């Protein structure tokens, strides 16, 4: 009986959809034949590698179908082909999947990229964007500190506090969106400037940069006016 209980426990945990298999895991089963006959390494990996300009790819599927596992395989595939990959699951630290909007995701991506790549490129364009809006945002970061008095590391920490409050303090969430949303175009502009500089300073064994944002499918559908958050995130922007 004990052995049966242990077996059931192991089986139950083996099928946990919230714990993807790492690339190269011996438990991986190739379900390509019954999942659309498309290999993510060929469909997305080669497209990313061969494109002469920046591309944006959407990888979708049913919950628990193995998307995260496939994306981790894609990460390993790209890294083996001279690509520097930044991978993160958006719902782990930055967004509340029960209430997520485009602005939340943009801020989450900005924070993650700043923290991951700050030593490889010049983050000043993004930090200057934050500095220009700090008087309007510092109360939402729950701080009275003047950003001009901080070094780069502390400035990035303040940006992280702002994004953390999007997830942790629901009563501030809509106010943060309302103050940031008019400036999303300029934030994207300075973020691209930062990434352009990063791409010039990649490690010697890398010649491309890829960003993989996972778990956006866990966002709950929200309709605000005429458009849903899905349409805003995946179509409009």
Region spans (language model):
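P-loop NTPase nucleotide-binding core
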Residues: 55-57, 61-209, 219-220
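Loop-centered beta-sheet repeat module
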Residues: 230-237
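Conserved ATPase-coupling elements of RecA-like P-loop NTPase cores
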Residues: 220-230
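Walker B catalytic acidic pair
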Residues: 214-218
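Short amphipathic alpha-helical segments, especially helix-boundary/capping motifs
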Residues: 32-33, 48-51, 168-172, 211-213
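Walker A/P-loop-proximal flanking segment of P-loop NTPase domains
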Residues: 1-86
């Amino acid at each position: 009986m004990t052995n049966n209980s242990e077996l059931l426990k192991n089986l139950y945990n083996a099928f946990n959809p919230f714990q993807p298999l790492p690339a190269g895991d011996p438990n991986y089963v190739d379900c390509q034949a019954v999942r659309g006959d498309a290999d993510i390494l060929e469909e997305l990996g080669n497209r990313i590698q061969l494109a002469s300009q920046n591309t944006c790819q959407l990888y979708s599927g049913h919950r628990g179908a193995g998307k995260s596992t496939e994306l981790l395989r894609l990460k390993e595939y790209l890294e083996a082909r001279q690509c520097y990959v930044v991978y993160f699951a958006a719902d782990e630290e930055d967004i509340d999947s029960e209430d997520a909007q485009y602005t939340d995701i943009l801020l989450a991506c900005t924070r993650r990229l700043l923290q991951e790549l700050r030593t490889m490129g010049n983050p000043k364009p993004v930090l200057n964007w934050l500095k220009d809006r700090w008087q309007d945002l510092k109360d939402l970061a729950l701080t009275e500190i003047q950003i001009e008095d901080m070094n780069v590391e502390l400035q990035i920490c303040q940006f992280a506090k702002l994004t953390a409050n999007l997830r942790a303090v629901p009563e501030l969430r809509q106010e943060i969106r309302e103050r940031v949303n008019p400036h999303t175009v300029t934030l994207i502009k300075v973020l691209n400037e930062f990434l352009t500089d990063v791409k010039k300073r990649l490690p010697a064994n890398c010649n491309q940069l890829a960003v993989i944002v996972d778990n956006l499918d866990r966002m709950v559908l929200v309709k605000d006016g005429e458009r849903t958050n899905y349409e805003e995130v995946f179509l409009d922007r």
